[in-house]
Amino acid sequence: MADIHTVEQSTVLHVREEIPTIISPTLGNVGPLTIATSTITTMFITLIFIILCISVSRSKLIPNKFQHLLEIFYEMVDSFIASIVGNKERAKEIVPYVGAIMTYLIIANLLPMFPLIGSFYITIDGEHFPLFRGATTDFNTTFGLALAVVVTMQVIGIREQGVFGYLSHFIQIKQVIKGFKKSFGEGMTSIVGFFVGLIEIVSELAKVLSLSLRLFGNMFAHEVLTVILLGAFSVAVPAIWMGMGLLVGVVQSIVFVALVTVYYSLVLKKEHGEH
């Protein structure tokens, strides 16, 4: 039987006593779905996200302080994406999707650092685990997010270029036929391009692992190092390591979003004059 309780916080930064496991502790099952501690965190983040969306939908002509902060954040994301894409109009199209991902990741990466969140523990078979495990320290979360991103990119690519136009980047049969019609040499060259296109399919699938493992590996490694370092230097290090944790959480969010922005811009239909 799982028992939920709280522990008193001695520092502004929550310090765990045990090194976290790669697999999140399981709380139970709802039908075929397994509910883990990271699932609770994800649901809590979703609730925060809904509150933010409601707040934005009720924005006023004369912004209050919170609305002003959200507008500053939007402008920062817009400028960041425009610097990657190199086209302000394209950036405006990408901002809503990528901005939502960045907001989610920043909340997910920084939420476990708040002392109130870290004060809730659950006892499973005599062992104590944090009730709110960092969502991005669970590979299931990062894999699901990366898979959703890659699938969305395929849908956008088909929407922008058409089914056959988009698939022609991967299965270049027409290029092979055209190549052999021109000459044998160009035909052989087009065959090479055909196999390169097939490799691109593998590349698209690899993006799922690349995005998910990068985010999971960095955030999980940071959590493990937090336990080790704060366990050894629990007096002097917490404030310094909290700053490092904030930096790691924000940087990993930016890296993930930058890669998604690049993937998004690649599947958009090229406009006249773009190369």
Language model features with spans:
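Selective transmembrane helix interface/packing segments
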Residues: A2-H275
